[in-house]
Amino acid sequence: MSNSRSILSQPEWRIVDQSSLGPTFHALQSFAMDDTLCTSIGKGESAATMRSWVHHNTIVLGIQDSRLPHLEEGISFLKENNFNVIVRNSGGLAVVLDEGVLNVSLLFQETEKGIDIDLGYDTMWHLIQEMLKDYDVTIEAKEIVGSYCPGSYDLSIRDQKFAGISQRRIRGGVAVQIYLCATGSGSERAALVRDFYNLAIQGEETRFTYPEIVPSTMASLSELLDETITVQDLMMRLLKTLQQFAPKLTPSQLTIDEIPLYETNLQRIIDRNNKALGLEK
C-alpha cells in the first residue's frame, strides 16, 4: 500500500469537521461542500482536505434508485419512518445515514500521472486499517453480496460489511468518501433499505438489477468489535492517524472565496435532487 501511503503523506491536511452540526445540517449541503472543496483543491487553491460529517436519519439514494417503478411508495415508507430522502450527485445506490454513522471525505489533487480509481479506494481502505489497527481483526475490501449499495470496496470484518466507499472527481480534484457504521444495528439499517426496495419494486421487472438485501450481511463496528465505538471515538482515531502522515493539521471552514461557489453548487444540487425526485413544478 505504499502508493496509498504517499497520498496520505501530505505536508498539510486541512480539516473541515462537520460531524457535530446536528439535525439541521442537510445532506445536500454535504455534497455541495465536497464539490466546492474538490474544485478548490483541483485549482491548487487549497491543501488536501479531510472533511468529516454526520447526518441525522437520511436515506441517500443513487440515480438508479430514482428510476424505481414505485419510487413514491418507497419514499413515503421512509418518511413514515422519520427519514429524509435525497438523491446524490454520483453513482451508487441507497445508503442509510444517522447519528451512528460517521462519513469521511478525503479530497486531494490529481497528480500529473493521474490517480487511478483503485488507488483512491486503496487510500481510504489503508486509512481505516490504520485507524483500527489496535484491534485484532482483518478488514477486507471486497463486495459483500446482500448488503445495500454493494461494491468491490465494501469494507468488512468476518464477511459483515460496516462501511462503503465511493469516489467523485471534479476538474483535477479527487474526493473519496466513506460511510462508517459506528454504533447501532447494521442489520436494522439494512432491513429498512430492503423494505424500501420491496415497496418501490413490488415484483416488477426493471432494467437495472437492484440488490436483494440480506440484513445479516451488515453490522456496525460496535457490533463487530463487541465494544462501543462512537462517532466521537472514530473522529479521535481519524485525527490521530492523519497526524502520523502529516506534520500539520489545520482546522478550517469554507474561505470567503469558496462561499459563492458553495452557494452555486448547493442550488445546482437542490435543483438536480428535486428533478430526480419529481418535485419540480
UniProtKB/Swiss-Prot annotation:
Mind telling me what this protein is named?
Answer: Octanoyl-[GcvH]:protein N-octanoyltransferase
| UniProt keyword annotations, A-Z | Acyltransferase, Transferase
The yes or no answer to whether the keyword Acyltransferase is present is: yes
For site (Lowers pKa of active site Cys), what residue positions does UniProt give?
K161
SUPFAM superfamilies hit by this protein: Class II aaRS and biotin synthetases (SSF55681)
Matching entries from PROSITE patterns are given as:
BPL_LPL_CATALYTIC
Signal peptide span = none
Q: Which reaction does it catalyse?
A: N(6)-octanoyl-L-lysyl-[glycine-cleavage complex H protein] + L-lysyl-[lipoyl-carrier protein] = N(6)-octanoyl-L-lysyl-[lipoyl-carrier protein] + L-lysyl-[glycine-cleavage complex H protein]
Q: Which GO biological-process labels does this protein carry? A: lipoate biosynthetic process; protein modification process
Might you give the EC number(s) for this enzyme?
A: 2.3.1.204
Q: What else is known?
A: The reaction proceeds via a thioester-linked acyl-enzyme intermediate.
MF terms in GO: lipoyl(octanoyl) transferase activity
Domain BPL/LPL catalytic positions: 44-250
Q: What does this protein do?
A: Catalyzes the amidotransfer (transamidation) of the octanoyl moiety from octanoyl-GcvH to the lipoyl domain of the E2 subunit of lipoate-dependent enzymes.
Q: Which family does it belong to?
A: Belongs to the octanoyltransferase LipL family.
Q: Which Pfam families match?
A: LplA-B_cat (PF21948)
The yes or no answer to whether the keyword Isomerase is present is no
Instruction: Please name the catalytic residues of this protein.
Output: C149 (acyl-thioester intermediate)
Annotated pathway: Protein modification; protein lipoylation via endogenous pathway; protein N(6)-(lipoyl)lysine from octanoyl-[acyl-carrier-protein]
